[in-house]
Amino acid sequence: MTTFTKLSEQETPSISVHASRRISKINPNIYAGFTEHMGRCIYGGIYDPGNPLSDENGFRKDVLEALKELNIPVIRYPGGNFTATYHWIDGVGPKDQRPARPELAWLGTETNHFGTDEFMKWCELLGTEPYFCLNFGTGTLDEALAWVEYCNGTKDTYYANLRRKNGREEPYNIKYWALGNEVWGPWQVAQMTKEEYAHKAYQWAKALKLLDPSLKLILCGQDGTASWDYYTLKQCLLPAHSPLSTSTVPLIDMHSIHMYTCGSTHLPNVTAPLAAERAIEITSSLIDLAMIENGIPPDQPRPTICFDEWNVWDPLRAEGSKGAEESYTLSDALAVAIWLNVFVRKSKDVGMACIAQSVNVISPLMTTKDGIIKQTIWWPLYLFSKYMRGWTINAHVSCGAYEGETSPKWIRAVKDTPWLDVSATLGEDGYANVAVVNISDEKDMECKFEGATGDVTVFTVTGDSVSACNMKGKEEVGLTESTWDGKGAYKFPRHSLTLLRWKAE
């Protein structure tokens, strides 16, 4: 938890950190990823058979090794909008017998050469857990139940045996399943009203948990601030109505929300993720309201928020229909750092967050035929995933605030926009970690710092300007490491992310 006192521009900024004041446990799943059959994410990204850089499975070895550096706990698959017309059965069995299908989300052709078993093999090599999204467009409940049976079944049943026939004896035990993707959107095949979706989602959830009670089901929300979110939570945050169950545990475990941010200039761009912080706060209250109105006993688990699509994305700059290949700037990297600060600050409410996406498509990692490029946004992801774990701890920031235009405009009315955006954690290893984003593109911030004990390791991500970017053969934004004695004031460079780390006493 970070609190803020607004100062005049003439007053001296300060940050105080209290490592002994633990606020909430951070779920490591806030550093989750996302791979969709879109653009070059799968084909030409993680899967590129015939490329000299690929292994015997067709998986790009350089991509696997790079993503291991991010220590990604969960990866969402296969979409995204793609799921609304995807039939999982097309993507299993001998590849020469798999049908090619028209793909309606991005208007391509899906070969189905990469499907459930390939993805699971890739996850095992990466050391990550899968999160599957069900087809709520053209899919059926029977099809969804069959997919769960194929993945998790242990009995002598048809789809469990089909998995065994396809070479996998043991069940995959896939835990996380989403009840559709952005079903509210007019771009979706088989878009629904909130009333239609809530009825269908509850019935599917009931059946899925009868088949496998261990599943964690994720409800399809909107952006956390819409009537869709309230209505679907109210209708679906209920226990199963079944003669076989007297449980009072809600069928729904998490509520999904999506948001992408961008701004036409640096300061609206870098402050835009504060809209997500307000959306999390509103969604959290809607979850509480649904539990109260539905009479869910207080001893039952409280659903958390699954922010399973987030990133900086300007669709005009990187059109989805053309593969959404963003070229990220330092400004975007600082915005991603603030996104991550938000998830740390709101760790009590956020159970998972999936950056969209993990390779090539609005991604920190780009592939070429002969290598990879770590974009500017790679570095905040790397630092946060490596160090910002454990518990959120108390920090207080006193500094001036940006008072100009924001994107969206309503941020100005509901959130402070300090020049220094901060989150703080205490790791299992006993180290305190403080992430500070100086959003100013003009001014270094000399800041009184209280709470550091002993020598401080300092990691800095910055560049010559907010427009600096990384491309093949030219890395303008990277990571530097230094030390500080932890005494007095620290100067946070303009347009930078700084992570301070020390052994707490």
Curated annotation (Swiss-Prot):
Pathway in which this enzyme or protein is active: Glycan metabolism; L-arabinan degradation
Record flagged with keyword Secreted: yes
GO molecular function per UniProt: alpha-L-arabinofuranosidase activity
Glycosylation sites noted in the Swiss-Prot or TrEMBL record: 81, 152, 269, 438
Main location as per UniProt: secreted
Keyword list, A-Z: Carbohydrate metabolism, Glycoprotein, Glycosidase, Hydrolase, Polysaccharide degradation, Secreted, Signal
GO process terms (BP): arabinan catabolic process; L-arabinose metabolic process; polysaccharide catabolic process
Pfam families found in the cross-reference section: Alpha-L-AF_C
Subcellular locations according to the entry: Secreted
EC class of the enzyme, as a word: hydrolase
InterPro entries assigned to the protein according to its UniProt record, in alphabetical order: Alpha-L-AF_C, Glyco_hydro_b, Glycoside_hydrolase_SF
UniProt entry tagged with the keyword Ion transport: no
Catalyzed reactions per annotation: Hydrolysis of terminal non-reducing alpha-L-arabinofuranoside residues in alpha-L-arabinosides
Domain of life the protein comes from: Eukaryota
SMART domains attached to this UniProt entry: Alpha-L-AF_C
Family under the similarity heading: Belongs to the glycosyl hydrolase 51 family.
Function, in words: Alpha-L-arabinofuranosidase involved in the degradation of arabinoxylan, a major component of plant hemicellulose. Acts only on small linear 1,5-alpha-linked L-arabinofuranosyl oligosaccharides.
Identification of the protein by name: Probable alpha-L-arabinofuranosidase C
The species this protein was found in: Aspergillus fumigatus (strain ATCC MYA-4609 / CBS 101355 / FGSC A1100 / Af293)
